[in-house]
Swiss-Prot record:
Belongs to the universal ribosomal protein uL6 family. GO terms for cellular component: cytosolic large ribosomal subunit. Part of the 50S ribosomal subunit. It comes from Shewanella baltica (strain OS155 / ATCC BAA-1091). GO terms for molecular function: rRNA binding; structural constituent of ribosome. PANTHER family: 60S/50S RIBOSOMAL PROTEIN L6/L9 (PTHR11655), LARGE RIBOSOMAL SUBUNIT PROTEIN UL6M (PTHR11655:SF14). It comes from the Bacteria. This is Large ribosomal subunit protein uL6. This protein binds to the 23S rRNA, and is important in its secondary structure. It is located near the subunit interface in the base of the L7/L12 stalk, and near the tRNA binding site of the peptidyltransferase center. Keywords: Ribonucleoprotein, Ribosomal protein, RNA-binding, rRNA-binding. One of its GO terms (biological process) is cytoplasmic translation. InterPro entries: Ribosomal_uL6-like (IPR000702), Ribosomal_uL6-like_a/b-dom_sf (IPR036789), Ribosomal_uL6_a/b-dom (IPR020040), Ribosomal_uL6_bac-type (IPR019906), Ribosomal_uL6_CS (IPR002358).
Length: 177
């Protein structure tokens, strides 16, 4: 049985949570997010907290309640503080440049790659080899970061590629004669 759902989500000052049938909307200083709640979960909003209760008779209701609680907590944190993901480009000639709402990547291919940023994600390039993605939706930030990393994942022999800032690349030794 999941114990995650037993802890309520506290609503900080400046954040408004509303429930309309099975649609939960969270509004805050950085934006607003909407999510459809699973039918196996009852959501109760009271006195600055959101509680999640499983529906009786549904076999995986506790699991769904725990998942819903984690997703709603990420929504509350996103609209109040926001999320950020840092990427680092490692390799000779690897560069990133922000052009409008697109990221222009030079990753050793014969052509530059242009990655279009979806709505709700902003990017910043403090240096030519660093990318900082910011937004309110944790899942969307992670998805965009994974797509950019997917163009040139770090390889184990020289460590070249696009990596997360906190990622440790396991290095291999080259073949010996």
């Amino acid at each position: 049985m999941s114990r995650v759902a037993k802890a309520p989500v506290s609503i900080p000052a400046g954040v408004e949570v509303t429930l309309n049938e099975q649609t939960l909307t969270v509004k805050g200083g950085k934006g607003s997010l909407t999510r459809v709640i699973n039918n196996a979960v009852n959501v109760v909003i009271e006195a600055g907290v959101v509680k999640f209760l499983p529906v009786e008779g549904v076999s995986n209701a506790w699991a769904q309640a725990g998942t819903t609680r984690a997703l709603v907590n990420n929504m509350v944190v996103g609209v109040s503080q926001g999320f950020e993901r840092k990427l680092k480009l490692v390799g000779v000639g690897y560069r990133a440049k922000l052009v409008g709402s697109d990221i222009d990547l030079t990753l050793g291919f014969s052509h530059p790659l242009v990655h279009k940023l979806p709505a709700g994600v902003t990017a910043e390039c403090p240096s030519q080899t660093d990318i900082v993605l910011r937004g309110v939706d944790k899942q969307l930030i992670g998805q965009v970061a994974a797509e950019i990393r997917g163009y040139r994942p770090p390889e184990p022999y020289k460590g070249k590629g696009v990596r997360y800032d906190d990622e440790v690349v396991r290095r291999k030794e080259a073949k010996k004669k």
